Amino acid sequence: MAPSQLPPIFNPTQQDIEQLLAAQCHLGSKNLQVHMEPYLWKTRPDGVNVINIGKTWEKILLAARIIAAVENPADICVISARPYGQRAVLKFAAHTGATAIAGRFTPGNFTNYITRSFKEPRLIIVTDPRTDSQAIKEASYVNIPVLALCDTDSPTDFVDVAIPTNNKGRHSIGLVWWMLAREVLRLRGTLATRETEWDVVPDLYFYRDPEAEENKEIADESKVATAEEVGAGAIESGFAGENWDTQGAGAGVPGTAFAAASAAGPTSWEADGADWAASSAPAAAGESWAETQPAEGKW
């Protein structure tokens, strides 16, 4: 990090530098655009260009001062066609009052007043000059200043202030937008002093994969359902055990019930025997029926 030319009050803290390094904001691409050379620290042996994070911090402060100078925050338009920056611009707009365009930029938003989405912003901020080229081109037609997060290979045509950083990683994009929002709130006076900690964590600005979140929710629900089934089975077995226990001694024991039935068995069998003796008469009747049948020759 090169020596900073900022007043001491604007110097970054150790935590700010560690966050920029942890989010890999200093790692650029292997290609280098000529206008991004002043922000280059060095080139690694594997060809990756390393960005000077001191320049990144200075440009974040400069961009924050430009944003804070706009009287109406709604006149600032933050744009991100790159998926990794869409959540960040929405959170930035929610915290600073700017207007967010997350996703595809409709051609004619700044030039065709007939469209429903027509806007006349005083300032636009884009996540990537390459993916948001349509917005930058239309801004150049109507003289709108442009702030952009630029990598080492990003085109800087019609970009007024370039913030050198890694604009391809989800963590680096989210962290730069978070730092930009924090500095804007500090300049506006929402945060009392620079030592005041912001209660919003950078993770809120990071991109989250909807499919991964959905799969995680499904897995959690399946775990809860399995736990409920196991608990219900244990409760049912517990109730069954209580019923078997509370029905008295010998309840649920087959041997006891059989012994009780066999105790009254002889009387019942004797009564049934009398009935069987009485039912022997039909058998005799059956024999007389056989005797009355005609011979085979008489059919």
From Swiss-Prot:
Q: Where is this region: Disordered?
A: 259-299
One GO cellular component term: cytosolic small ribosomal subunit
Q: Which keywords does this Swiss-Prot/TrEMBL entry list? A: Cytoplasm, Ribonucleoprotein, Ribosomal protein
Q: What's this protein's function?
A: Required for the assembly and/or stability of the 40S ribosomal subunit. Required for the processing of the 20S rRNA-precursor to mature 18S rRNA in a late step of the maturation of 40S ribosomal subunits.
The family classification in the record reads: Belongs to the universal ribosomal protein uS2 family.
Give the compositionally biased regions (Low complexity).
Answer: 259-291
Taxonomic source organism: Aspergillus oryzae (strain ATCC 42149 / RIB 40)
* Complexes and interactors: Component of the small ribosomal subunit. Mature ribosomes consist of a small (40S) and a large (60S) subunit. The 40S subunit contains about 33 different proteins and 1 molecule of RNA (18S). The 60S subunit contains about 49 different proteins and 3 molecules of RNA (25S, 5.8S and 5S). Interacts with rps21.
Can you cite a GO biological process for this protein?
ribosomal small subunit assembly
This protein's record includes keyword Cytoplasm: yes
Q: What is this protein called?
A: Small ribosomal subunit protein uS2
Q: Which GO terms describe its molecular function?
A: structural constituent of ribosome
What PROSITE patterns does this protein's entry cite? RIBOSOMAL_S2_2
Q: Where in the cell is it found?
A: Cytoplasm
InterPro entries per the UniProt record, alphabetical: Ribosomal_uS2 (IPR001865), Ribosomal_uS2_C (IPR032281), Ribosomal_uS2_CS (IPR018130), Ribosomal_uS2_euk (IPR027498), Ribosomal_uS2_euk/arc (IPR005707), Ribosomal_uS2_flav_dom_sf (IPR023591)
